[in-house]
Amino acid sequence: MRPSEGISVSDAIRSRRSHRHYLPDPIPTHTLDRVLELTLEAPSAWNYQGRSIVVVSDPDVRAGLEAATGGQPHPREAPVVLVFLAEMDAWRRDNHDVFHSARRSGAWSEQFIAGSAESSRTFQQDLLERGLEREYAVKDAVIAASFAMLAATEQGLACSPMNGWDETQVKKVVGVDDRTDIAVALLLPLGFAAEERRHPGRRPVSSSVHYQHYRTTLTDTSGRIS
């Protein structure tokens, strides 16, 4: 797979596969920069952008990620691994740059900015009291990772979202083992595919899409209810 810039979103979604093996070829800097730029266009709660990406290309650091994933080949073979981190304290920090950018572009009014600042504090405090702050932050980081997968596919790169790893080890490898306010959301190896992966198929829409209410019965491929 090589750069295919200009493909449609639909084509990127349908052609993306999860690759376990990669060529040793480095990713051109401009290609990686493009993927990162598009990734950071992902939406986030209150636009606080409480997610960070650690770009890991050093072989020794990737070896640490390989160990943290139980010896899976992706982090070792891929020239780059993106580690998506969720920042649970994003709402507590100074977000005036976010407000300034939205004000300057005309996206947010002064009234909306004032309301958002107050509402976000109340909302996040409620999450904290219910023990949901981590879960909420991880969602934002995973949304960004989804954007990264599509951006990588558009640029002709292969990738594979990884959710099987030891978080304590991953945090130590990327230097945040002392940060209780940061959680690991996802690992995403990137590179040029060394294998062809065929589409394994998906269940029909009728078995996964529900209207108005969730139903416990499933429709098989023949249309029968089971």
Where do the PLM segments sit?
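Acidic, surface-exposed loops and disordered segments
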Residues: 1-226
